[in-house]
From Swiss-Prot:
Transit peptide, residue positions per record: 1-67
Protein name stated in the entry: Maltose excess protein 1-like, chloroplastic
Residue ranges of the TM segments: 93-113, 123-143, 154-174, 180-202, 217-237, 238-258, 268-288, 306-326, 361-381
Keywords: Chloroplast, Maltose metabolism, Membrane, Plastid, Plastid inner membrane, Transit peptide, Transmembrane, Transmembrane helix, Transport
Topological type in the membrane: Multi-pass membrane protein
Localization per Swiss-Prot or TrEMBL: Plastid, Chloroplast inner membrane
Function description: Probable maltose transporter. Essential for the conversion of starch to sucrose in leaves at night, probably via the export of maltose from the chloroplast.
Length: 399
């Protein structure tokens, strides 16, 4: 990948040749150079659009040569070869995250299948279909976000997440744990979401249809997120659908105003980014709810699987290098949060209550810190920065 060169401000007219004082006085009536003639203001008889386009073409034609532009710019420290190597490696890391994420759902799918074959439908009622539906909506939102950015590895991760979660939901519907109308509506949304994201990824989808889909997941995500957060503390606060209704109504109003052009450019961009951030916050809230449950019922910690938490930490950790490399703050926030809180945080709770050994916890902690250090070190080299702090600043505040 070629390094970018900082732009220089070009003069409106080409600079005259440099002469000594004597030569300039002797040739005072010197004829203008072809470049000067070419960039003279055009006749006012030509249309304004034609004059501006032609003038722009001539400015580009007689612009400073590349050597002059390069000489006035800052030196580029980035090594193209190392940049491309790290680009390819981070993409492979993101793709490899499919393995731990798929292993997270397979045990539940196999267990549900065994119970269904044995006729034990009651066992599937222990799996909350509303929670699975929430995760499915989060996967669809993130799938749309990464499909728009053409991040192949992340697209595959989210697609497998949608499919595996939908399989569990289908099993719950077969056990009559999930009502049939909700399952039919969910199936329609999943089919439409996968089809639209597939078409958009390959550039085969009209922009109008994609905007409608983005509006749908924005409103749906903003309606679900506050409701899930509210439901976490239901034993201590009254059970109510009001948070979801209010948030969904506000989201619908914001989307309509953005499409009607009633918002500023910054407001429109903010509304456009809501679906991705909503899905990220939704996944970020899940480990918070788990740790809140651990706090209320410490005895439940014995039922947690250390292997499951380790898979969650590894899967999210594998996506951190790619998020840092492309300077995607939303992706980095979600992956780092899940890796630390959902994975390492729950392992820390299990260690505090003697569910896992000290050696296992320390080895996991050391491995996670070593991985983060390796990520920042390689990213610093790839981008040609002087220190990892510079990479973090670019991630948080942009270049």
């Amino acid at each position: 990948m070629s390094s970018s060169v900082s732009s220089v401000r070009l003069p409106l007219r080409a600079a005259p040749p440099l002469y000594g004082r004597r030569e300039w006085r002797a040739d005072g009536a010197r004829a203008p150079s072809p470049a000067l003639v070419a960039v003279k203001p055009l006749s006012c008889r030509a249309p304004a659009s034609y004059r501006s386009a032609l003038l722009l073409h001539r400015r580009r034609r007689y612009a400073l040569p590349p050597v002059a532009a390069t000489a006035t710019s800052k030196p580029v420290l980035k090594d193209p070869k190392k940049y491309q190597e790290w680009d390819s490696l981070t993409a492979k890391f993101a793709g490899a995250a499919n393995v731990p994420f798929l292993l997270l759902q397979l045990p539940q799918i196999i267990l549900n299948a065994r119970n269904l074959l044995a006729g034990n439908k009651t066992a599937l009622f222990a799996v909350p279909w509303l929670g699975m539906l929430t995760g499915l909506l989060g996967n669809l939102s993130l799938l749309s976000y990464f499909a728009k950015k053409k991040e192949t590895g992340a697209v595959i991760v989210q697609t497998l997440g949608v499919i595996s979660t939908y399989v569990v939901i289908a099993q719950l519907a077969m056990a009559e744990s999930m009502p049939l109308p909700q399952f039919v509506a969910t199936s329609a949304v999943v089919a439409a979401g996968l089809l639209l994201n597939f078409l958009n990824y390959f550039g085969w989808l009209p922009g109008t249809l994609w905007l409608l889909w983005e509006d749908f997941i924005t409103i749906g995500g903003l309606a679900v997120l506050p409701q899930v957060m509210w439901s976490t503390f239901v034993p201590f606060i009254p059970n109510s659908l009001l948070p979801g209704i209010i948030s969904g109504s506000l989201a619908a109003t914001a989307v309509v105003m953005a499409r009607m052009g009633k918002l500023s450019k910054g407001g429109i961009n903010f509304v456009g980014s809501l679906s991705g951030w909503t899905a990220t916050l939704l996944f970020m809230w899940m480990p918070v709810a788990q740790m809140w449950t651990n706090y209320l019922n410490p005895s439940n910690i014995k039922g947690l699987s250390a292997f499951t938490m380790l898979l969650a930490m590894i899967g999210n950790g594998l996506m951190i290098p790619r998020a840092v490399f492309i300077r995607d703050l939303m992706w980095f926030t979600g992956s780092a949060w899940a890796s630390f809180l959902q994975g390492w945080g729950n392992l820390a709770c299990m260690y505090c209550f003697d569910s896992i050994s000290r050696e296992s916890f320390l080895a996991t902690t050391f491995g996670l810190l070593l991985w983060l250090g390796f990520t920042l070190w390689r990213d610093t080299i790839a981008h040609g920065n002087s220190s990892p702090v510079t990479s973090l600043k670019e991630l948080l505040f942009g270049k």
